[in-house]
């Protein structure tokens, strides 16, 4: 078993370095050997370089390296440098101490992979940006269960919304398994989930997502009224809905991605 795979060993390591888990960085260190192995298996095959965001104390980093991955680990918390240099000593890892949101993701090699226990507060903006780059073959990451549900939701469900459609536009999304708070140290207040995204190669479409954001901007309203409130001519929206065979009182959460794409075509040039 890894020396980082128990709360006791992690606590001892932190105390030895005079450190603590910092909530500012969303630090909840994964201490479950079983779940570490399952994450590595979900990320295989390692057909390109692997980028890990938020390596923390290096448990997942070590597991990936031992499985043969070529890893670049990006950590914002400079306090963890001596810890990572200790726990990953002798292993061929590239450590980068930088804010992951400022990393030049558009320049990573084509076919790269993301494998990470993501700091929860940056998960949504980071994943959205990585998908837009078109550089990744696969993204496998831990997030709050609630965020995973939003990424993989079906139409007509409470979790379905803009994030669901952004992810679906760029990738096939899978929620693989859930992790209890006890799999981490310190334990978070919520469950987590492992998500795997397999990009489809679809380019970014700003016009589509202006429409989607307008549609969900007034979630309690009908789609017709929400779009009218956002500046779309009501008559054009009514006409486009009729052309799609949709009733005038349809709501945004009833439309899947393909329906939004067709609606966007019907509203071309409307705003």
Swiss-Prot record:
In its UniProt record, a GO molecular function of this protein is: RNA binding
Location in the cell: Cytoplasm
**Keyword Disulfide bond carried by entry:** no
Catalytic activity, reaction form: adenosine(1518)/adenosine(1519) in 16S rRNA + 4 S-adenosyl-L-methionine = N(6)-dimethyladenosine(1518)/N(6)-dimethyladenosine(1519) in 16S rRNA + 4 S-adenosyl-L-homocysteine + 4 H(+)
The principal localisation class reads cytoplasm
Query: What residues bind S-adenosyl-L-methionine, as annotated?
Result: 28, 30, 54, 75, 99, 117
SUPFAM superfamilies to which the protein is assigned, alphabetical: S-adenosyl-L-methionine-dependent methyltransferases
| Keyword vocabulary terms for this entry | Cytoplasm, Methyltransferase, RNA-binding, rRNA processing, S-adenosyl-L-methionine, Transferase
Q: State its Enzyme Commission number(s).
A: 2.1.1.182
Q: Which domain of life is it from?
A: Bacteria
Question: Record's Gene Ontology CC terms?
Answer: cytosol
Q: Which family does it belong to?
A: Belongs to the class I-like SAM-binding methyltransferase superfamily. rRNA adenine N(6)-methyltransferase family. RsmA subfamily.
Q: What does this gene product do? A: Specifically dimethylates two adjacent adenosines (A1518 and A1519) in the loop of a conserved hairpin near the 3'-end of 16S rRNA in the 30S particle. May play a critical role in biogenesis of 30S subunits.
* NCBIfam families from the UniProt entry: ksgA
Q: What is this protein called?
A: Ribosomal RNA small subunit methyltransferase A
Q: Which organism is it from?
A: Thermus thermophilus (strain ATCC BAA-163 / DSM 7039 / HB27)
* Phylogenetic lineage: Bacteria, Thermotogati, Deinococcota, Deinococci, Thermales
